Amino acid sequence: FSDEVTNKKFIKKNKKFLGYYSFSNFKKRIYYLFNNILIWKYRKKSSSFIFRYYRLLNFQDFPIKMKSNKKKFSFKNFLIKLYVRLLSINFILFLIKKILNNKYFLNKDVSVYLKKINPDLVIYPTNAFEPLVSEIPIICKLYKTKSFFLIDNWDNLSSKSILINHPDYISVWGKQTANHANKIQNIPQKEILIGGTPRYDIFFKKEI
């Protein structure tokens, strides 16, 4: 589990619990900036990407007039526009991905846990945006383990960013999200499973 979870006392009661993983604020920032580059680079894949980009700029230059998007110079926005355009150049983007995928940059906590238990499959629930989502597929390949993502919400694959590394398999809510996985994230259909969501299971129980 991430060290940011809230119910740690309950988690520690599980005898199979191995421990937490963590990310430094610096590394979180790196992935945040990289995701901003990706939403600009692949903005034509989803209208939600370009909306997220404008939100990053406080809706400056947004096509629809809003109180917060009046034409005024913002040095912060200027820097954002500059770095997303410059770093989204194919060659530079390739180099950044190479660095992020380097085994010396990967999460050490997760690597230690996988080496210790040597699993056949790693099942990872995700919103498709946090730093570890980019590292799990690479770490699993290093230890010759299959990776399986459980996507947390119906719009995560169309509204967050682009997955720079694909898992071996991915489970989604329904047909719409399966289409997002294939068309937006370029995940082959044979690797996409429609698993639904456990959030609604309680409504089908006789007693609530």
Question: Where in the sequence are the language-model features?
Answer:
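Structural motif
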Residues: 1-4, 23, 125-128, 152, ...
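Conserved N-terminal ligand/cofactor-binding loop architecture of enzyme catalytic domains
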Residues: 1-110
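Short, charged/polar "capping" segments at the starts of alpha-helices
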Residues: 4-10, 131, 177-181, 203
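Short, flexible loop segments at the rims of nucleotide/cofactor-binding pockets, characterized by
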Residues: 97-102, 124-127, 147-150, 207
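A nucleotide-sugar donor-handling region in carbohydrate enzymes
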Residues: 101-103, 151, 165-208
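Membrane-proximal helix-turn-helix segments that form the acceptor-binding/catalytic region
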Residues: 109-112, 157-169
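Short N-terminal targeting/anchoring amphipathic segment
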Residues: 111-130
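Active-site proximal beta-strand in glycosyltransferases
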Residues: 121, 125-126, 134-153
